[in-house]
Amino acid sequence: MLVISANEQRKLVNMNEVIAYAALALQEFSAERTITPIRTSLPFANEQNTALIMPSVAEGLEALGLKVVTVVPENKKIGKKTINGIVMLSDFQTGEPLALLEGSYLTMIRTGALSGVATKHLARHNAKTLCIIGTGEQAKGIAEAVFAVRDIEKVMLYNRTEEKAYAFAQYIQEKFGKPAYVYANANEAISEADIIVTTTNASTPVFSEKLQKGVHINAVGSFRPNMQELPSHAIANANKVVVESKEAALEETGDLQVPVREGLFEASDIHAELGQIISGEKAGRESDEEITVFKSVGLAVVDIIVAKYLYEKAVERGVGERIEF
């Protein structure tokens, strides 16, 4: 079995390739060619902490694996990662364990890739400005993916802890060579954005202003019913709300459950799963005036396909450590 660390994965990753593999996984899922149960969510130690268990099989892509990840928001106060995890990949024919991959970095790039796919199909082609609300680790992968699919010229940042936003602004300037500005108010930060990303653990909406026409949102932070990043009017007034899995999104996120409860949105109002747009079964953006929302809660099959991509690259390049059971 091959063990692949976060640093080793970092050297293997090409974001455009990861975006392509994520799109393939989404398409297989929406065509009902995978077995991807709704993940098991286990609270532990306190009500904020969550352990997530996510298996998946993708027959057509010959992939079998399991992801286990923990989310501990308070870890940031003691200088530790808030997301920790592992992904186990098994041989599709024999069931033997093939690889064990560090899971927090993989989660970051897969989360980014999902937003990259959504941005490619749902943001305006001429989108130039990106607003990121929440500047933790997950935001790095999303920024990289959005930059990969759109010609971003300016980035606006908002974070509850301003120092982290300034550090992220420096990261943007160094990695992408584009100006990044920190705002003290989230409503001001979104005011001139073509693309908005929310990646927080907020339980109440992170902005309140009405959205401008033509904007696209990637909302990735809320993965539990008691978490809500988007104001209900953002969901209710969107022309298209898109998800990875309708069943999972409706069961798992307050971003949809709250507006449904308030009578502002119905399950049938979800425009499409992202895989249906990739395949051409449903339309993506159809005009520059549309407001589009991608509400992401993650999808195990994408993790497993990205893990397989990393495993195959690692084998090809002789990266990782072989261990015997």
Swiss-Prot record:
What keywords does the record list, in alphabetical order? NAD, NADP, Oxidoreductase
Check the record and name the InterPro entries matching this protein.
NAD(P)-bd_dom_sf, ODC_Mu_crystall, ODC_N
Keyword Ion transport appears in the UniProt entry: no
Q: Which Pfam families match?
A: OCD_Mu_crystall
Q: Which GO terms describe its molecular function?
A: oxidoreductase activity
Q: Which reaction does it catalyse?
A: L-proline + NAD(+) = 1-pyrroline-2-carboxylate + NADH + H(+); L-proline + NADP(+) = 1-pyrroline-2-carboxylate + NADPH + H(+)
Q: What is its EC number?
A: 1.5.1.49
Q: Which GO terms describe its cellular component?
A: cytoplasm
Q: What class of enzyme is it?
A: oxidoreductase
- What domain of life? Bacteria
The family this protein is said to belong to: Belongs to the ornithine cyclodeaminase/mu-crystallin family.
Q: What does this protein do?
A: Catalyzes the reduction of Delta(1)-pyrroline-2-carboxylate (Pyr2C) to L-proline, using preferentially NADPH over NADH as the electron donor. May be involved in a degradation pathway that converts trans-3-hydroxy-L-proline (t3LHyp) to L-proline.
Record's protein name: Delta(1)-pyrroline-2-carboxylate reductase
Q: Which organism is it from?
A: Bacillus cereus (strain ZK / E33L)
Gene symbol here is: arcB
